[in-house]
Amino acid sequence: MNWQAVSVATKNEAIETVADILLQVGAQGVQINDHDAISVTAYYPDDEQLGETITAIQKALKHLSDIGMSVAPATITVNGIQQKDWEDNWKAYYHAERVTRHFTVVPSWETYHPNQIDELPIIMDPKLAFGTGTHETTRLMIQALENVVRGGESMIDVGTGSGVLAVAAKQLGVAHVLATDIDEMSVNVAKENLRLNPVAQDVTVVASDLLADVVISPVDLIVANILADVIERLIPQTTTLLKPGGLFLVSGIYDNIALHIEDVLRANDYTIVQKSQMGEWHGYIAQLKEKN
């Protein structure tokens, strides 16, 4: 079978939105180029349905523009790829990468030996999801976990994606992790990566629109690395599922909306205890106020 590489040129703050569109129309994974000209690439079979797929992508991009969410330039390019090249391209694109002081993200096909005694590998299969653990927002979240986890905590990972934050939390000693994502396809993606990491075998993954379908006793930590507009909707949901004094770790927040998200956090009884920034992305550690 031959494949076509479909690339969408976009901008930094729209990467995850564009990636989600490509996944929704049938991609098994995406590649993100966020170094020079920003683009997101996905692979689709070169068959009679390809035209419909590209049309669906165009419509989704136009819809975002119509509702005021800019993904410009949003130009689409298509290039033919042979089956072998498509398979090899994933492996050529991803290699083991140190992402924080303690963590290295390792593709599942690479044999990797830690260079330091305190180094913690996270095994990921990047073919399955765009959250491979190397994007700035994910680095911010893993660093936040390194800062706050003491061991034995309970945690919810909202919008788990590849499951990378759930694995990192277990590596650091979090006792109980519940991970959520929007649908069964996303849940299966996370489960595949969790199976690659023995420490995360007991992580529970469920389909839920943010926390709407989560019924659980309040936890010590809630983490979320998702789109900023979704974070705004999530914040009020966290307050009933987080223990008083518990911590909410959040990223996926671009420069131009960071101050607004800070206001939303404060309006929902959070105190911001740490702000972090990597490039144009912001991350926060916020503490839920104790009840009087």
UniProtKB/Swiss-Prot annotation:
Belongs to the methyltransferase superfamily. PrmA family. It holds the Pfam family PrmA. This is Ribosomal protein L11 methyltransferase. InterPro entries: Ribosomal_L11_MeTrfase_PrmA, Ribosomal_PrmA_MeTrfase, SAM-dependent_MTases_sf. The gene is prmA. Methylates ribosomal protein L11. The keyword NAD does not apply. GO terms for biological process: methylation. GO terms for cellular component: cytoplasm. One of its GO terms (molecular function) is protein-lysine N-methyltransferase activity. It comes from the Bacteria. Transmembrane segments: none annotated. It catalyses: L-lysyl-[protein] + 3 S-adenosyl-L-methionine = N(6),N(6),N(6)-trimethyl-L-lysyl-[protein] + 3 S-adenosyl-L-homocysteine + 3 H(+). CDD domains: AdoMet_MTases. Keywords: Cytoplasm, Methyltransferase, S-adenosyl-L-methionine, Transferase. It is found in: Cytoplasm. S-adenosyl-L-methionine binds at T138, G159, D181, N225.
